């Protein structure tokens, strides 16, 4: 459909033929990634600072256009102005691999008679088309991967199944932020292994680095339309672990000067849009703390930063605008099995922003969030991550729990607004 919208009258016949071909060969994560060129461009300005398959949603984050801000009109002096480019970016919360998450995936694999140890596809079946629907999808890989023969470990020092990296690629994620308080749970070698496994799966990693040279190269992904999107990130802590002085560059931290310098480097290297991620906040708090608020003010005041998103609190935090730019203070988890005394940790959001090109650069013209929820694992009751709205619509899952998740997520997303008003321009899907 996007192709048809951009082709003139002269190309109608060719367009119709292409449309038939597209219908005959539906897009997949692999196809999309083949069209998404990943560019890593050196820039001298970068600095190094001291849960049975579930329902498939029928409405994958399609946001109505009638209430979005109209773009400026084309210059009337141009008879045939070039088509405006757009890019949709999807971000999701923590992939936090507690041992019961693996146990659920192992149960699915055994039940289906599979040879592999784990089957995460069943757990995320309802989320896959949503991830694939975006031009650029970004996950947060919270913890490092183990080696093939290493003993897996869960909280508090994680070593997750290495098979997850390949699965992340198959889901349709194009990049993962990897900076977190667990980044070096398995030391520098675990950090390197995690980045390398993601790279082999066709997924870029952001926020951790295998060498000083890698840190100096902004991560920029180029879409099929040629839109260059830079991603930078940083974490608040390493959980008391320390890197040796000669490896201090291996993890990006969340101080504003560092993140702004990386954003400027990405813009200098050609990025049209720069997304800044941070990992921080108070765990299980639905509101941002003073550090988050101060950091966001600094980041959004920089012309190099176009949008800020975050995770770590393990519960959903507000979405708002600061200095005229969208900020997602916390997306909650994408999957986890936290202590059940924290029921909101079994909920999260995926957020989707559409950037449209104007004569003054790219700006957000559509913004939406999609509430998600999943169950506590027990043998015979495997985890299923469900988009809340479509699950309610289709009558799948625990209705009472879904209704509560829906209400609590809406309250959290709009938590900074007076009287719980909905954030202007933000849609729920």
Predicted features, each with a name:
Residues 3-11, 18-30, 35-38, 43, ...:
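Acidic, metal/ion-coordinating pockets
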Residues 47-49:
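Low-complexity, intrinsically disordered segments with a bias for serine/threonine
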């Amino acid at each position: 459909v996007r192709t048809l919208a951009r082709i003139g009258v002269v190309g109608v016949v060719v367009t119709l033929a292409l449309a038939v071909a597209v219908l005959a060969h539906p897009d997949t994560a692999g196809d999309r990634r083949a069209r998404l060129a990943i560019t890593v461009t050196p820039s001298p300005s970068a600095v190094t600072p001291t849960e049975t398959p579930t329902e498939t949603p029928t409405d994958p984050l399609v946001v109505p256009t009638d209430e979005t801000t109209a773009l400026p009109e084309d210059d009337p002096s141009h008879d045939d102005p070039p088509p405006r480019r757009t890019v949709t970016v999807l971000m999701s919360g923590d992939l936090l691999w507690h041992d019961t998450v693996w146990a659920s995936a192992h149960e699915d694999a055994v039940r289906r008679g599979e040879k592999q140890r784990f089957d995460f596809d069943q757990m995320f079946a309802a989320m896959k088309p949503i991830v694939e629907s975006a031009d650029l999808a970004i996950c947060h890989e919270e913890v490092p991967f183990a080696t093939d023969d290493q003993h897996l470990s869960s909280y508090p020092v994680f070593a997750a199944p290495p098979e997850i990296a390949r699965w992340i690629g198959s889901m349709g994620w194009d990049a993962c932020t990897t900076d977190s308080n667990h980044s070096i749970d398995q030391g520098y070698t675990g950090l390197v292994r995690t980045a390398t496994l993601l790279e082999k799966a066709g997924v870029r990693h952001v926020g951790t680095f295998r060498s000083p040279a890698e840190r100096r190269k902004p991560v920029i992904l180029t879409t099929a339309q040629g839109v260059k999107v830079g991603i930078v990130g940083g974490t608040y802590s390493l959980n008391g672990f320390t890197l040796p002085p000669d490896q201090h560059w291996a993890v990006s931290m969340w101080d504003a000067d560092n993140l702004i310098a990386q954003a400027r480097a990405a813009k200098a290297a050609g990025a049209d849009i720069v997304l800044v991620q941070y990992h921080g906040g108070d765990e299980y708090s639905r509101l941002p703390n003073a550090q988050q608020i101060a950091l966001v003010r600094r980041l959004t005041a920089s012309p190099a930063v176009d949008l800020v998103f975050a995770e770590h609190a393990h519960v959903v935090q507000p979405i708002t605008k600061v200095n005229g730019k969208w900020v997602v203070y916390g997306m909650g988890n994408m999957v986890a099995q936290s202590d059940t005394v924290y029921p909101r940790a079994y909920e999260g959001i995926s957020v989707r922003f559409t950037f449209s090109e104007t004569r003054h650069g790219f700006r957000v013209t559509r913004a939406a969030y999609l509430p998600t929820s999943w169950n506590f694992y027990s043998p015979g009751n495997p985890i299923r991550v469900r988009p809340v709205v479509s699950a309610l619509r289709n009558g799948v899952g625990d209705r009472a729990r879904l209704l509560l998740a829906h209400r609590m997520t809406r309250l959290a997303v709009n938590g900074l607004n007076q009287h719980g008003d909905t954030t202007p321009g933000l849609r729920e899907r």
